[in-house]
Curated annotation (Swiss-Prot):
Residues 1-12 have a biased composition (Gly residues). It comes from the Bacteria. One of its GO terms (biological process) is translation. GO terms for cellular component: cytosolic small ribosomal subunit. Belongs to the bacterial ribosomal protein bS18 family. Part of the 30S ribosomal subunit. Forms a tight heterodimer with protein bS6. It comes from Azorhizobium caulinodans (strain ATCC 43989 / DSM 5975 / JCM 20966 / LMG 6465 / NBRC 14845 / NCIMB 13405 / ORS 571). The gene is rpsR. This is Small ribosomal subunit protein bS18. Pfam families: Ribosomal_S18 (PF01084). Residues 1-22 are annotated as: Disordered.
């Protein structure tokens, strides 16, 4: 079962190259994760109030745990909402 390619050339298409994202909290002048820094924490909360996963934000696993703990602490203290309607 051989399939002939239309157009002849036989060249394969290169796959889409996706650049690997780096963690925004690693590096020399990276911001510190603090539960009082509401403006920073809001960047990692969805419009429904959920914590955005690290595969989307490119945060490392260690920093994602710190980030989620800071968001939960800020929610408990009333600095961030639990749910956004």
């Amino acid at each position: 079962m051989a399939f002939a390619q239309a157009g002849g050339g036989g060249g394969q298409r290169r796959p889409f190259f996706r650049r690997r994202k780096t963690c925004p909290f690693s590096g020399p002048n990276a911001p510190k994760i603090d539960y009082k820094d509401v403006r920073l924490l809001q960047r990692y909360i969805s419009e429904r109030g959920k914590i955005v996963p690290s595969r989307i934000t490119a945060v490392s696993a260690k920093k994602q745990r710190e980030l989620s703990a800071a968001i939960k602490r800020a929610r408990f203290l009333g600095l961030l909402p639990f749910v956004i309607r």
